[in-house]
């Protein structure tokens, strides 16, 4: 492992009710849907908790290429920290889960258009996002980090060479943070974790900025890379998200997170899905139990 090199501590269009009903029916949901309006003015479509129960299926958006948080294994099964949590939610709700592969840039869109009922995809809570979706209680801590090849370890973003490009994923907090705080750093934007990872490996950018959990995992899993900046900007939290105004589902998820805290569920989740990547050293830094940030 390379832990010694890593500091301890990565068309929002609204649809009408008729279109929403078609989407929800196709996903196995109720033909009846509720609507609300987000801060952007977009019409938001969602299924209430009772409608989800009645349908027998909940549609949950997760990543399919972001090991160890959400990915598809060699058997075609979804796995990871977020997926482990999702399966427990489905079990306790008494419904089947329809996993919907999502990218960072379409998490809000998928909620607003009713394609998913819930997002569990390393979704960092921000004020801007909270105007468009409703976040439940958090279940993980996170900050931003920067990973680069061992031959050019990036330890500071000050005095950045304007010819060098930073790799980011569109729709992430890393993109927003760098745009607002380091506008002179050229950003090379990709739509997915996999394409950003490939870009770094192919030398298309000098470094990759993302959630520190993700860049640390990348460096631990890939020889020749170092996380030179393990905490960039503010410390934030990861939380589930539902469509704006879907209070019945939001309240249920919040109560579930509180209840799961009593059994230290997210520590068990960490042990099952993250310990092989991070070891024990990061567990208390990352895990949030019962929605209570220490």
Regions found by a protein language model. Name each.
Residues 1-6, 13-26:
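N-terminal secretory signal peptides
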Residues 27-36:
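Bacterial lipoprotein signal-peptidase II cleavage site
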Residues 29, 173-190, 227-229, 257-294:
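Ligand-binding clefts/hinges and TM-proximal coupling segments of bilobed small-molecule sensing domains
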Residues 37, 148-165:
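Flexible hinge/capping segments at coil-to-helix
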Residues 41-122:
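Extracytoplasmic small-molecule ligand-binding "clamshell" domains
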Residues 98-109, 170, 188-198, 202:
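Short helix-initiation/N-cap motifs at beta->coil->alpha
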Residues 109, 123-131, 180, 201-202, ...:
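A ligand-binding cleft/hinge motif common to bilobed small-molecule-binding domains
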Residues 141-148, 216-257, 276-294:
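Periplasmic-binding protein-like
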